[in-house]
Amino acid sequence: MPANLTPEYKAVEAAFRKARDPRERLEGLREMLRTIPKHKGTDHLQGDIKRRIKELSEELDRPQRGGARGGPALVIRPEGAAQIALIGPPNAGKSSLHARLTGSAAPAAPYPFTTQYPEPGMMPHENISLQLVDLPAVSPEHPVPWLASALQTADAALLVVDLCDPASLEQIEAVRTILRERRVTLTDRWEPAGESPGVAAEGDGDPFVLRLPTLLVANKVEGLADGDAELRAFLEVTGLRYPAFTVSAATGQGLGNIGPWLFSHLGIARVYTKAPGRPPDRGRPFILHRGQTVEDVARLVHTDLARSLRYARIWGTSGFDGQQVGREHPVEDGDVIELHS
Protein backbone atom coordinates (compact mmCIF):
# COMPACT_ATOMS: atom_id res chain seq x y z
CA MET A 1 0.00 0.00 0.00
CA PRO A 2 1.40 3.44 -0.89
CA ALA A 3 2.51 5.56 2.05
CA ASN A 4 0.71 8.72 0.78
CA LEU A 5 2.73 10.98 3.06
CA THR A 6 1.35 14.45 3.74
CA PRO A 7 3.15 17.75 3.07
CA GLU A 8 3.28 18.34 6.84
CA TYR A 9 5.05 15.02 7.41
CA LYS A 10 7.44 15.61 4.50
CA ALA A 11 8.45 18.99 5.96
CA VAL A 12 9.11 17.39 9.35
CA GLU A 13 11.11 14.59 7.70
CA ALA A 14 13.20 17.11 5.74
CA ALA A 15 14.07 18.90 8.99
CA PHE A 16 15.02 15.58 10.60
CA ARG A 17 17.35 14.74 7.70
CA LYS A 18 19.29 17.95 8.34
CA ALA A 19 19.47 17.65 12.14
CA ARG A 20 22.82 16.63 13.63
CA ASP A 21 22.44 17.29 17.35
CA PRO A 22 21.16 14.08 19.03
CA ARG A 23 18.42 15.88 20.96
CA GLU A 24 17.26 17.69 17.84
CA ARG A 25 17.15 14.34 16.05
CA LEU A 26 15.08 12.83 18.88
CA GLU A 27 12.61 15.71 18.74
CA GLY A 28 12.48 15.31 14.95
CA LEU A 29 11.67 11.61 15.29
CA ARG A 30 8.86 12.37 17.72
CA GLU A 31 7.44 14.94 15.31
CA MET A 32 7.66 12.41 12.47
CA LEU A 33 5.69 9.91 14.54
CA ARG A 34 3.13 12.56 15.45
CA THR A 35 2.54 13.73 11.87
CA ILE A 36 2.84 10.49 9.88
CA PRO A 37 -0.48 9.26 8.44
CA LYS A 38 -1.66 6.22 10.41
CA HIS A 39 -2.59 3.42 7.99
CA LYS A 40 -1.22 0.08 6.80
CA GLY A 41 0.97 1.71 4.17
CA THR A 42 3.06 3.39 6.87
CA ASP A 43 3.14 0.54 9.41
CA HIS A 44 6.75 -0.37 8.63
CA LEU A 45 7.93 3.26 8.74
CA GLN A 46 6.06 3.88 12.00
CA GLY A 47 7.80 0.85 13.52
CA ASP A 48 11.18 2.10 12.33
CA ILE A 49 10.55 5.55 13.83
CA LYS A 50 9.44 4.07 17.18
CA ARG A 51 12.53 1.84 17.33
CA ARG A 52 14.84 4.77 16.67
CA ILE A 53 13.08 6.92 19.28
CA LYS A 54 13.62 4.15 21.83
CA GLU A 55 17.30 3.66 20.93
CA LEU A 56 18.16 7.36 20.90
CA SER A 57 16.23 8.03 24.12
CA GLU A 58 18.12 5.25 25.87
CA GLU A 59 21.46 6.58 24.64
CA LEU A 60 20.70 10.14 25.72
CA ASP A 61 19.51 8.95 29.15
CA ARG A 62 22.57 6.76 29.59
CA PRO A 63 25.08 8.04 32.21
CA GLN A 64 28.22 9.16 30.46
CA ARG A 65 31.90 8.59 31.16
CA GLY A 66 32.66 9.35 34.79
CA GLY A 67 29.15 8.53 36.03
CA ALA A 68 28.57 5.92 38.70
CA ARG A 69 26.93 3.46 36.34
CA GLY A 70 27.84 4.90 32.99
CA GLY A 71 30.41 4.23 30.34
CA PRO A 72 31.78 6.03 27.31
CA ALA A 73 29.29 7.87 25.13
CA LEU A 74 28.27 5.98 22.00
CA VAL A 75 26.86 9.08 20.29
CA ILE A 76 29.13 12.13 20.32
CA ARG A 77 27.44 15.53 20.47
CA PRO A 78 28.76 17.63 17.55
CA GLU A 79 31.14 20.48 18.39
CA GLY A 80 33.11 22.89 16.26
CA ALA A 81 32.37 23.71 12.64
CA ALA A 82 31.67 20.12 11.56
CA GLN A 83 31.91 16.54 12.79
CA ILE A 84 34.04 14.13 10.75
CA ALA A 85 34.02 10.38 11.45
CA LEU A 86 37.20 8.31 11.03
CA ILE A 87 36.24 4.94 9.54
CA GLY A 88 38.37 2.06 8.36
CA PRO A 89 39.39 -1.59 8.68
CA PRO A 90 41.58 -2.93 11.50
CA ASN A 91 45.18 -1.65 11.70
CA ALA A 92 44.68 1.11 9.13
CA GLY A 93 46.19 3.64 11.54
CA LYS A 94 43.02 5.59 12.35
CA SER A 95 43.91 6.19 15.99
CA SER A 96 47.44 7.34 15.17
CA LEU A 97 46.03 9.66 12.51
CA HIS A 98 43.45 10.99 14.99
CA ALA A 99 46.15 11.64 17.58
CA ARG A 100 48.35 13.47 15.04
CA LEU A 101 45.53 15.68 13.77
CA THR A 102 43.90 16.51 17.10
CA GLY A 103 46.62 16.07 19.71
CA SER A 104 44.37 13.63 21.56
CA ALA A 105 45.69 10.95 23.86
CA ALA A 106 43.49 8.25 22.34
CA PRO A 107 45.13 4.81 22.59
CA ALA A 108 46.93 3.59 19.47
CA ALA A 109 48.67 0.24 19.15
CA PRO A 110 50.05 -2.03 16.38
CA TYR A 111 47.33 -4.63 16.97
CA PRO A 112 43.71 -4.56 15.77
CA PHE A 113 40.62 -3.24 17.58
CA THR A 114 42.44 -0.86 19.92
CA THR A 115 39.58 1.64 19.66
CA GLN A 116 36.50 0.30 21.46
CA TYR A 117 34.38 3.46 21.79
CA PRO A 118 34.04 6.78 19.94
CA GLU A 119 36.98 9.09 20.69
CA PRO A 120 36.35 12.78 19.89
CA GLY A 121 39.07 15.35 19.32
CA MET A 122 39.33 18.82 17.79
CA MET A 123 41.46 19.57 14.72
CA PRO A 124 42.27 23.29 14.48
CA HIS A 125 41.98 25.06 11.12
CA GLU A 126 42.65 28.79 11.02
CA ASN A 127 40.23 30.31 13.59
CA ILE A 128 37.85 27.34 13.86
CA SER A 129 38.04 23.66 14.76
CA LEU A 130 36.69 20.51 13.13
CA GLN A 131 35.63 17.66 15.39
CA LEU A 132 37.20 14.32 14.42
CA VAL A 133 35.65 11.19 15.95
CA ASP A 134 37.74 8.02 15.88
CA LEU A 135 35.45 4.98 15.68
CA PRO A 136 36.14 1.27 16.18
CA ALA A 137 37.45 -0.64 13.17
CA VAL A 138 34.80 -1.99 10.81
CA SER A 139 35.24 -5.72 10.27
CA PRO A 140 32.98 -8.78 9.89
CA GLU A 141 35.05 -10.47 12.62
CA HIS A 142 34.30 -7.75 15.16
CA PRO A 143 30.79 -6.28 14.61
CA VAL A 144 29.92 -3.01 16.35
CA PRO A 145 26.12 -2.90 16.81
CA TRP A 146 25.94 0.82 17.56
CA LEU A 147 28.22 2.01 14.75
CA ALA A 148 25.45 3.30 12.46
CA SER A 149 23.90 5.25 15.34
CA ALA A 150 27.24 6.89 16.10
CA LEU A 151 27.53 8.03 12.47
CA GLN A 152 24.18 9.84 12.43
CA THR A 153 25.68 13.03 13.85
CA ALA A 154 28.58 13.15 11.36
CA ASP A 155 28.80 15.59 8.46
CA ALA A 156 31.41 13.58 6.54
CA ALA A 157 33.87 10.70 6.84
CA LEU A 158 37.57 10.01 6.48
CA LEU A 159 37.94 6.47 5.13
CA VAL A 160 41.40 5.41 6.31
CA VAL A 161 43.32 2.58 4.61
CA ASP A 162 46.79 1.10 5.00
CA LEU A 163 48.23 1.58 1.53
CA CYS A 164 51.05 -0.88 2.30
CA ASP A 165 48.69 -3.76 3.10
CA PRO A 166 47.56 -5.87 0.11
CA ALA A 167 44.53 -6.96 2.15
CA SER A 168 43.21 -3.38 2.06
CA LEU A 169 41.50 -4.07 -1.28
CA GLU A 170 39.17 -6.64 0.28
CA GLN A 171 38.93 -4.82 3.61
CA ILE A 172 37.61 -1.61 2.10
CA GLU A 173 34.88 -3.45 0.23
CA ALA A 174 33.96 -5.22 3.47
CA VAL A 175 33.73 -1.87 5.27
CA ARG A 176 31.46 -0.43 2.58
CA THR A 177 29.27 -3.54 2.54
CA ILE A 178 28.84 -3.63 6.33
CA LEU A 179 27.87 0.03 6.39
CA ARG A 180 25.43 -0.34 3.48
CA GLU A 181 23.71 -3.14 5.40
CA ARG A 182 23.23 -0.61 8.20
CA ARG A 183 21.85 1.99 5.76
CA VAL A 184 25.00 4.10 5.68
CA THR A 185 26.55 4.90 2.29
CA LEU A 186 30.03 6.37 1.95
CA THR A 187 29.57 8.54 -1.11
CA ASP A 188 32.15 10.26 -3.30
CA ARG A 189 29.74 13.13 -3.89
CA TRP A 190 30.41 16.27 -1.88
CA GLU A 191 27.33 18.47 -2.06
CA PRO A 192 27.43 21.89 -3.73
CA ALA A 193 27.71 24.90 -1.46
CA GLY A 194 24.55 25.55 0.48
CA GLU A 195 23.44 21.93 0.73
CA SER A 196 23.93 20.16 4.03
CA PRO A 197 26.48 17.33 3.92
CA GLY A 198 25.63 13.95 5.34
CA VAL A 199 21.94 14.15 4.44
CA ALA A 200 20.01 11.61 2.41
CA ALA A 201 18.56 13.23 -0.66
CA GLU A 202 14.84 13.84 -0.55
CA GLY A 203 13.10 11.37 -2.79
CA ASP A 204 15.22 8.44 -1.59
CA GLY A 205 12.06 7.09 0.04
CA ASP A 206 13.92 6.07 3.18
CA PRO A 207 14.52 8.91 5.66
CA PHE A 208 17.03 6.79 7.56
CA VAL A 209 19.52 6.21 4.76
CA LEU A 210 22.61 8.25 5.61
CA ARG A 211 24.92 9.36 2.80
CA LEU A 212 28.26 10.54 4.15
CA PRO A 213 30.57 12.43 1.78
CA THR A 214 33.90 10.65 2.09
CA LEU A 215 37.58 11.51 1.71
CA LEU A 216 39.88 8.50 1.28
CA VAL A 217 43.02 8.82 3.40
CA ALA A 218 45.76 6.43 2.24
CA ASN A 219 47.95 6.00 5.31
CA LYS A 220 51.40 4.54 6.03
CA VAL A 221 53.01 5.79 2.81
CA GLU A 222 56.33 6.14 4.65
CA GLY A 223 56.88 2.49 3.71
CA LEU A 224 56.42 3.05 -0.04
CA ALA A 225 58.80 4.29 -2.72
CA ASP A 226 56.02 6.18 -4.57
CA GLY A 227 52.87 6.58 -2.49
CA ASP A 228 51.02 8.61 -5.12
CA ALA A 229 51.55 5.91 -7.75
CA GLU A 230 50.37 3.24 -5.31
CA LEU A 231 47.25 5.28 -4.57
CA ARG A 232 46.45 5.66 -8.27
CA ALA A 233 46.81 1.90 -8.71
CA PHE A 234 44.64 1.25 -5.64
CA LEU A 235 41.85 3.47 -6.96
CA GLU A 236 42.06 1.91 -10.42
CA VAL A 237 41.85 -1.66 -9.10
CA THR A 238 39.00 -0.93 -6.66
CA GLY A 239 37.08 1.37 -8.99
CA LEU A 240 36.59 3.82 -6.12
CA ARG A 241 36.10 7.46 -7.04
CA TYR A 242 36.62 9.09 -3.68
CA PRO A 243 38.81 12.17 -3.50
CA ALA A 244 42.00 10.91 -1.87
CA PHE A 245 45.24 11.92 -0.18
CA THR A 246 48.38 9.99 0.71
CA VAL A 247 49.53 10.58 4.29
CA SER A 248 51.75 9.19 7.00
CA ALA A 249 50.50 9.38 10.58
CA ALA A 250 54.00 8.25 11.62
CA THR A 251 55.95 11.08 9.96
CA GLY A 252 53.24 13.71 9.45
CA GLN A 253 53.59 13.63 5.65
CA GLY A 254 50.51 15.02 3.88
CA LEU A 255 48.52 15.74 7.04
CA GLY A 256 48.52 19.48 6.40
CA ASN A 257 46.31 18.96 3.33
CA ILE A 258 43.36 17.47 5.20
CA GLY A 259 42.07 20.49 7.15
CA PRO A 260 42.03 22.99 4.25
CA TRP A 261 40.44 20.42 1.92
CA LEU A 262 37.67 19.59 4.39
CA PHE A 263 37.03 23.26 5.10
CA SER A 264 36.57 24.13 1.43
CA HIS A 265 34.43 21.10 0.57
CA LEU A 266 32.14 21.28 3.61
CA GLY A 267 30.99 24.72 2.46
CA ILE A 268 31.64 26.30 5.85
CA ALA A 269 30.96 30.03 6.12
CA ARG A 270 32.43 32.01 9.02
CA VAL A 271 30.30 35.07 9.68
CA TYR A 272 31.14 37.93 12.05
CA THR A 273 28.71 40.40 13.60
CA LYS A 274 29.14 44.06 14.49
CA ALA A 275 27.16 46.75 16.30
CA PRO A 276 26.51 50.06 14.49
CA GLY A 277 29.52 52.35 14.69
CA ARG A 278 31.76 49.66 16.15
CA PRO A 279 34.34 47.28 14.66
CA PRO A 280 33.32 43.65 14.08
CA ASP A 281 33.88 41.02 16.74
CA ARG A 282 36.38 38.71 15.06
CA GLY A 283 37.16 36.70 18.17
CA ARG A 284 34.73 33.90 17.46
CA PRO A 285 32.77 33.60 14.20
CA PHE A 286 29.28 32.22 13.82
CA ILE A 287 29.48 28.99 11.81
CA LEU A 288 27.06 28.48 8.93
CA HIS A 289 27.10 26.78 5.55
CA ARG A 290 27.37 28.75 2.34
CA GLY A 291 23.87 29.40 1.07
CA GLN A 292 22.42 30.04 4.50
CA THR A 293 21.01 33.49 5.03
CA VAL A 294 21.12 36.63 7.15
CA GLU A 295 18.05 35.31 8.97
CA ASP A 296 20.02 32.19 9.93
CA VAL A 297 22.74 34.42 11.40
CA ALA A 298 20.15 36.36 13.41
CA ARG A 299 18.70 33.09 14.71
CA LEU A 300 22.13 32.03 15.96
CA VAL A 301 22.47 35.33 17.81
CA HIS A 302 18.98 35.05 19.37
CA THR A 303 15.65 33.61 18.26
CA ASP A 304 13.87 36.86 19.16
CA LEU A 305 16.24 38.79 16.89
CA ALA A 306 15.39 36.48 14.00
CA ARG A 307 11.71 37.30 14.46
CA SER A 308 12.17 41.06 14.80
CA LEU A 309 14.89 41.48 12.14
CA ARG A 310 14.10 44.29 9.67
CA TYR A 311 17.28 44.41 7.60
CA ALA A 312 21.05 44.01 7.80
CA ARG A 313 24.14 45.74 6.47
CA ILE A 314 26.85 43.55 5.08
CA TRP A 315 30.58 43.79 4.37
CA GLY A 316 32.24 41.00 2.39
CA THR A 317 32.08 39.00 -0.81
CA SER A 318 28.29 38.57 -0.81
CA GLY A 319 27.70 42.33 -1.23
CA PHE A 320 29.40 45.71 -1.45
CA ASP A 321 30.60 47.25 1.81
CA GLY A 322 27.71 48.53 3.92
CA GLN A 323 25.05 47.24 1.52
CA GLN A 324 21.57 47.00 3.04
CA VAL A 325 20.13 43.52 2.56
CA GLY A 326 17.06 41.57 3.61
CA ARG A 327 16.74 38.48 5.76
CA GLU A 328 16.93 36.11 2.76
CA HIS A 329 20.32 37.40 1.59
CA PRO A 330 22.81 34.47 1.40
CA VAL A 331 26.05 34.76 3.36
CA GLU A 332 29.60 33.87 2.34
CA ASP A 333 32.71 32.96 4.30
CA GLY A 334 34.22 36.02 5.95
CA ASP A 335 31.12 38.24 5.77
CA VAL A 336 30.60 40.88 8.46
CA ILE A 337 26.95 41.56 9.28
CA GLU A 338 25.27 44.37 11.19
CA LEU A 339 21.76 43.28 12.23
CA HIS A 340 18.94 45.82 12.62
CA SER A 341 15.62 45.02 14.31
Model-derived regions: residue spans:
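Short, charge-rich amphipathic alpha-helices with coiled-coil/heptad character
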Residues: 1-4, 30
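Switch II of P-loop NTPase G domains
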Residues: 10-17, 64-82, 102, 113-120, ...
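C-terminal-of-GTPase-core extension/linker across diverse P-loop GTPases
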Residues: 17-82, 87, 92, 98, ...
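A conserved segment at the C-terminal end of the G1
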Residues: 91-107, 116
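Conserved protein kinase catalytic core
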Residues: 106, 140, 168, 225-226, ...
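Short beta-alpha junctions and helix-cap segments that line functional grooves
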Residues: 109-110, 144-147, 324-327
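Acidic, Ser/Thr-rich peripheral helices and adjacent loops at domain boundaries
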Residues: 177-186, 263
